[in-house]
């Protein structure tokens, strides 16, 4: 995640949620808005679990994003963890995330 910045304002989240593309995968929801900026946000609500579980799921999603980062187009990405993320293996999540990003046409 060297090249990507974090979201800074609530308006950025709102614009991606309203205008951007959305794709449901097993364990994660991906929001993508094509933009000249390179930004990322990883979100896990309290539905996912307690703080330890939420933090672990966010770390996993960040690690997966780092694997695909160099192949992705510029834009704003939001990854929302679903509550079943805790039951899936890392390789299964990787496969699902890659499939979702491909469906959203995020790869260069």
From Swiss-Prot:
State a single Pfam family of this protein.
Ribonuclease_P
GO MF annotation list: 3'-tRNA processing endoribonuclease activity; ribonuclease P activity; tRNA binding
Question: Magnesium among the record's keywords?
Answer: no
For this protein, the record's InterPro entries field holds: Ribosomal_Su5_D2-typ_SF (IPR020568), Ribsml_uS5_D2-typ_fold_subgr (IPR014721), RNase_P (IPR000100), RNase_P_CS (IPR020539)
The biological processes this protein is annotated with in GO are: tRNA 5'-leader removal
One GO term of the cellular component aspect? Answer: ribonuclease P complex
Reactions accelerated catalytically: Endonucleolytic cleavage of RNA, removing 5'-extranucleotides from tRNA precursor
Q: Which UniProt keywords apply?
A: Endonuclease, Hydrolase, Nuclease, RNA-binding, tRNA processing
Described purpose of this protein according to its UniProt entry: RNaseP catalyzes the removal of the 5'-leader sequence from pre-tRNA to produce the mature 5'-terminus. It can also cleave other RNA substrates such as 4.5S RNA. The protein component plays an auxiliary but essential role in vivo by binding to the 5'-leader sequence and broadening the substrate specificity of the ribozyme.
Complex formation: Consists of a catalytic RNA component (M1 or rnpB) and a protein subunit.
Identify this protein by name: Ribonuclease P protein component
Species annotation = Campylobacter jejuni subsp. jejuni serotype O:2 (strain ATCC 700819 / NCTC 11168)
Quote the gene name from the UniProt entry: rnpA
């Amino acid at each position: 995640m060297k090249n990507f910045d974090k979201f800074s304002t609530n308006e950025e989240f709102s614009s991606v949620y309203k205008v951007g593309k959305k794709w449901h995968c097993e364990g994660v929801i991906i929001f993508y808005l094509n933009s000249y900026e390179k930004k990322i946000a990883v979100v896990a609500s309290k539905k996912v679990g307690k703080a330890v579980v939420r933090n672990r799921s966010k770390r996993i999603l960040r690690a997966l994003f780092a694997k695909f980062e160099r192949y992705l187009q510029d834009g704003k990405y939001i990854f929302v963890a679903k509550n079943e993320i805790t039951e899936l293996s890392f390789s299964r999540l990787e496969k699902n995330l890659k499939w979702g990003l491909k469906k959203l046409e995020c790869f260069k």
